Amino acid sequence: MLIRRLAALALLVAFCLVTGAAAAPPKDAMVVGLLAEPVTMDPPQITDLNSARITKRIFEGLVAQELGSYKLVPGLAQSWEISKDGLTYTFKLRPNVTFHDGTPFNAEAVRFCFERQLNDKSPYYATGTYPYVKSFLGNIASVEVVDPLTLQIKLKAQLAPFLQYLAHQSLFVYSPEALKKWGKDIVKRPVGTGPFKLDAWEPGVKVVLVRNDGYWGGAPKVRQAIYVPIIEAQARLAAIKTGEIDLTMDVPPDSLDDLRKDPNVVVAESNSSAAWYIALNTRHPILKDKRVRQALNYAVNKDAIIRDILKGTAIVSRGPLSPVYGPYHEESVQKYPYDLEKAKALLKDAGYAGGFELTFLVPESGSGMQSPVEMATVIQANLATVGVKAKIQTLEWGAYLKKYLEAPDMAEMSWNPSIGDPDHMMYMLLSSDRFPPAFNAGFYQNDKVDDLLRKGRTTVDEKARVPLYREAQKVIVEDAPWIFVDHGKQVIIYRKRVQGFKLHPNFDLVLTQVWLQ
């Protein structure tokens, strides 16, 4: 731990020496302290929040999300029409838009980007660790260029969240000519149409974006956006308090009261759509018994975790969907309150009164992972009180993600939905259609849930969709494929000189509207 802390502080010192930020950031540059180095800047290959927070400033999709909400607004498509049968979407693209390399944005460029992910015979085929487009939009029949500024996408079947998914970063549009020029190096040479463009990337030190003065939506007020990886929470806290950075997140929760009193910073908070849970391997010879999984839920003191570790920056999870999902959130499901006697009774009934041993996979840090090691230690102690020995195995985030999809006994995870549709949480994580390499890492399967979630995807009428997801939640919570822990609040800390910043429910850091005093 000490070595990692010193390494994180060394990175911060190196950043300050390079940028001159030790006293304060440049007057017209905004400095953001991220939790980790971005992994890639190629939209189809992004699986982490740190990469997404940067690349969303560089690239855009056909549709966008309104600032501060999941409401859809025009993006690179200025309008669209949907056929009566719900299978054909016709997009009218914005005229006179160019990529950062000067090449034109048009329908052929959009088709190229879709084709790259849908056609595994393409010489440029790439999806990264997780094939987002095939999972999100696997029922695409064709992507056709009608004319330079008109694109038509035909579906094999209706997909209710289709437009929502077009706002996901994996479907952002990039320069085909840049990809052809740089090939695999495109992961560090992003060329989009967005309000910022890449100026420099010094691995382990900083990523520098400069504003796109020719941006179709109007140039940002901030001249530069500088992102520095600061792995340790204490180092991020020190940097925001001294003014070395302008904005950060995931500082130690016990520091928030003092930060709220600091006249130089703003602590912005809101509930989120995120879920923090422990995936249980339902194929494990012991965990395949629902009674055991229920017992583990009763054995974990979630209220204590939120009170003592997270300092109130979360709410107890009832199930997979947070209250942010509004009518889709099923309030009647049980919370699995902390109840050791009930946990012991269930284990005895299942034949495991003497306890058993499991491997518990835990990341050292990562996108939205709150305080993973501290939380794991408490959960380990909770489980020990009912005879379950959870052997913690910690890994750095990149190695952890790979291991997570290799059927560990139990593993921590946080899911921060990029879109506001329940499909992105429930179908992606809990349908048997989404076994690894997709993200149903516990191999949970329930025929009734599968049927409800598939119907939810293809039912366009929202009033008809709501009861499908609410019923699915009841079954899922009863089955307990996860230890449902919490829905973390979004907490962003920024300096008072930052004006116009607004929280986004998917944890994005939108800077287009920001200005600096």
Model-derived regions: residue spans:
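Extracytoplasmic/peripheral linker and loop segments enriched in polar/acidic and small residues
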Residues: 385-401, 406, 427-495, 517
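Ligand/substrate-recognition segments at binding pockets and active sites
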Residues: 32, 203, 348-419, 462
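Surface-exposed binding/hinge segments that line
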Residues: 92, 111, 129-177
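Gly/Pro-rich hinge or "lid" segments in bacterial periplasmic/extracellular proteins
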Residues: 66-67, 148, 159-220, 224, ...
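Structural transition elements
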Residues: 316-349, 367-374
